[in-house]
A protein has these predicted regions:
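C-terminal functional module detector
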Residues: 1-263
Length: 263
């Protein structure tokens, strides 16, 4: 398990204690999982953390400078995802399967969750395997065989996983057993669609996919027009996810939407 301390960034008029404090109090700030990602977002030309009014569509603009290739940028209004941007194209590679797991036992300290386990195929060959988001000698792949892989992993909310390169038919069955998960699926299933298993607990899940982000774009801008006629307070914010599993989250921009009524 490798969990870095998070970073906070503040938009400040000047590099002074007072201006940094004012920027924080105005919510002109965002957080990351530890990477020095640059993130900016505006809605109707007001910046993150601000409160404004609108009687029409909301024009949203954002800019990201990552420290690794960007997997996606997700734009939300409160908990509802409005749009997902992919600066790097996603492509399906039928012979590479990415399996991700995550979760925690509870919200307090000591919430670590063990995912020691492995997977096995009933036919075909595993050509190679790469641990994902495991960077310490204590965790990672233990055994790589022709049809099985075992590993040691522990999460406390972050995602970890494994990328396997296989030569197998669609009928091949993969049996995955780690943490609370005991899962079986056909290779043909994951080749045709992304798979997800929710395991309860605190955001405990496993996913499997043949979709991959292999391009190398670190920087992106995006635009979106929200012309939803919903009345009331809107809260627009952005989540950035990189291929190295680092993330960034903006503070919300609050827009009070007052719908014009025809007289």
């Amino acid at each position: 398990m490798t969990v870095l301390g998070g970073l906070g960034a503040v938009f400040s008029r000047d590099l002074s204690r007072r201006d940094i404090y004012n920027g924080m109090m105005a919510r002109h700030c965002y957080g990351t999982t530890g990477a020095r990602i640059y993130l900016d977002i505006t809605a109707n030309k007001v910046r993150m953390g601000d409160v404004s009014n609108s009687s029409g569509p909301t024009n949203i603009w954002g800019c990201v400078h990552g420290t690794a290739p960007i997997e996606y940028i997700a734009l939300f209004n409160r908990s509802r995802e409005l749009r997902r941007f992919h600066p790097n194209a996603e492509t399906r590679d039928m012979n590479r399967i990415k399996i991700i797991w995550s979760g925690a036992t509870h919200q307090d300290r000591g919430r670590f969750m063990k995912w020691d386990g492995g997977l096995e195929m009933n036919s075909g060959v595993i050509m190679g395997a790469i641990p994902l988001n495991m960077y310490t000698a204590k965790y990672g792949i233990d055994v790589l065989g022709e049809r099985h892989v075992t590993w040691r992993s522990i999460t406390s909310g972050q995602e970890e996983g494994i990328l396997i390169h296989i030569n197998a038919s669609d009928d091949t069955v993969i049996a995955f057993e780690a943490g609370p998960a005991k899962i079986k699926f056909n290779v043909g299933e994951v080749r045709s669609s992304n798979l997800r298993w929710d395991l309860g607990g605190l955001d405990q899940f496993v996913t499997a996919s043949t979709l991959h982000t292999d391009d190398n774009t670190f920087d992106a801008e995006f635009d979106y027009i929200d012309d939803s006629p919903v009345e009331g307070e809107q809260a627009y914010w952005v989540r950035v996810v990189q291929t190295d599993f680092h993330r960034a989250w903006s503070s919300p921009i609050y827009i009070e939407n007052k719908i014009r009524k025809n007289l």
